[in-house]
Amino acid sequence: MAYNWPRTLQDASTTSEPVELYRSLLSSADDHSMNIISIGFLTNLADLLRSKSDDVNSMSGPDLISAKVSELVVMGGYYPSGWEFNFGGEDPDATAYVVENWPKDVPITYSGGELGGEIFSGQSLTEHSPPDSPILAAYQWYVGRCSTLRESWDPLTTLYGILGLDGFERIGVKSPLAFANEFGYNSITSSNGSNAWVNDSSVTNQHYLRLADGVSNSSVAWLLDQLYIHDPIDERCFS
């Protein structure tokens, strides 16, 4: 993808380290204005939490997060309990550190493997995408075997991270998602990254997602496909 589409970055060695970039972006943001969407391992977020005052900002990592972040959205875990790759596949200690040390005044929403793993999107890309679509190319190269159909873990998480539960009306549809719980928290086994939801009425800042009542996997796949194939020149989301 990097070699086939125009880009401003020419040399990856000139990029900032992840924590430096996080601290710089958060420092320049308005208070409580940033959603962080995590669709991979949690190592960089753990390092952000451990970061200290520096030349970029005098606040510690947790204080900077509390001041600038409105919500953390995580593609990770399996609900109400289980094992999932983003939590346990590479750095389970980081998973446990982030989940256990994330500031209590900043909500966390989890999109689990059981949710996106049952929604197969991308089928419409080959027939309906603009021919120069980087989304089409990404799916063709990654999925392979003349297919663009794939599970929707990351796209679904990203869509929620952008719109939340209440923002879908901005694109003319009802929210296909809902919170699966009113209270409770994620408990992580640091040795392997497995998780289990603990019902605790005193904890109300953590949620995991489910499909809204009456919503099917296929209807969410259709919605994602419409966004994948949408021409960015067209200001309308749906015709």
Segments the model singles out, each with a brief description of its role:
Residues 1-4, 153:
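Short intrinsically disordered, low-complexity coil segments enriched in acidic
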Residues 3-117:
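Active-site histidine-anchored catalytic micro-motif
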Residues 86-239:
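Conformational coupling and interaction surfaces
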